Amino acid sequence: MLVKVYGSAVFGVEATTITIEVNIVKGIGYHLVGLPDIAIKESNFRIAAALQNTGYKIPGKKITINMAPADMRKEGSAYDLSLAIGILAANEQIQSDEIEKYIIMGELSLDGGLQPIKGALPIAIQARKEGFKGFILPAQNAKEAAIVDNLEVYGVENIKEVINFFNGERELVRTIVDTRKEFYKNLEFPEFDFADVKGQETVKRCMEIAAAGGHNIILIGPPGSGKTMLAKRLPSILPPMTLHEALETTKIHSVVGRIKDTGLMSHRPFRSPHHTISDVALVGGGTYPQPGEISLAHNGVLFLDELPEFKRAVLEVMRQPLEDREVTISRAKFSITYPSSFMLVASMNPSPSGYFNDPEAPVNSTPAEMQRYMSKISGPLLDRIDIHIEVNPVPFEKLSDDRKGESSSEIRKRVIAARNIQTERFKEYEHIHYNAQMNTKQIQKFCKVSEESLKLLKNAMMKLNLSARAYDRILKVARTIADLEGTDNVQPHHIGEAIQYRSLDREGWFGNS
């Protein structure tokens, strides 16, 4: 008897429906075709044990299973449940015409229990798109899949529940999530707050400018000056995620199985990989490509602590995704594109010893050591970082002050107002949403400056020996400062403030010339 069951495969952040055809005839043998990987080929052992331990059995006949489309490689153990249901239906241990109306996915334990799967959200989205009635999956993934409207989602604990459901012996409890309610309930409660930061008013101002214009930023300071603390609080002042952004972000985290029992992600992600990370782990890849850290930081913040400690080759592969806001991973027979629109926040010590030009420091590095230290960060990468700011240690008087600083919610209000101005400014441009994304043509159009401002900029570049690449960055940051003030034109004092935020472009900094 021939039976069809439907599962799904995830490629990139999109799902493709897989038709599982199970045919049972007289004879012996178990044949599984359609480019399954090792985990799927091993499923017959898990299925046999699970069925035996729940009172069922694999028939002693010839079983042929085809996973179509046959030219698409399938991977993982998430097909266990669909294969098992297909075998039972083909052997008439399940009597139902409803099986073909559902996507069925789940990894089987030997006792018949179900383990969670990866990619439940994109699978649910594709199931709704193709008109399936429902999605049966492990209970741990039910809330995540139930984000999708107009699709019946049933979370189950074991295979026996599914068998009894299709045999009409029991009803399954549908998982229902009020997506908007869940999303907005968690939206206003960031984990960290700028009110906790003592002192560092100049750096806080820089973080506000970076958030308002989407500018990448690097923090330079000795150990213990608060660089990591400041970076962790940046997501709390970024504009709240829209429902569309939240869905997009949740899909990526779903693919790697990082969604717990939370459903829709409502906070912007903050990713902080260790400096020993490989290039594949950072940008994504592998034999079966998976999203990397830059994609997991999509719509959020990627924090690279101790930037010069990262391998130069690892940093270099990040250059193109920073520019394109996406990363494409190519293999011989296919390519996958992951979104990677994130804000880069980097931090570094001012020298290998951690101190620079500090007479009280116990160790100072030689010029040669500092040159080697800085050479790990290439010019093209620094070219993509708009704001460089030095972070100094906080004096004892400010550390011991009990007064709270300005809260993240207050700063966020100003950031949102500035972003609204930019949304209106760039409404005719499809791929530009904030100031950091402007190219030379848009800078000329939207960052017009007076003769006085030009004179100030020229003098600063000559006296401070700023590099040529700093020119456009200064104008973009100045435009954001003007937006925060709500002024139409870039004024001289906006230029003056933006010039301060180009520390690494100054001649003499680590031997720059």
Language-model features: locations:
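Peripheral, non-AAA+ core regions of ATP-driven protein-machinery
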Residues: M1-I218, P222-S225, M265, S330, ...
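Short beta-strand elements
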Residues: I18-I24, L282, D386-I389
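Basic, amphipathic alpha-helical bundle interface domains used for macromolecular binding and assembly
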Residues: V33, A39-N44, P59, N66-G76, ...
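P-loop NTPase nucleotide-binding/switch module
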Residues: R170-I209, G213, P240-I294
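Walker A/P-loop
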Residues: L219-R258, D324
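The Walker A (P-loop) glycine that initiates the GxxxxGKT/S ATP-binding motif of P-loop NTPases
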Residues: G221, G284, E306
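Walker B catalytic acidic pair
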Residues: N299, D305-L307, V317
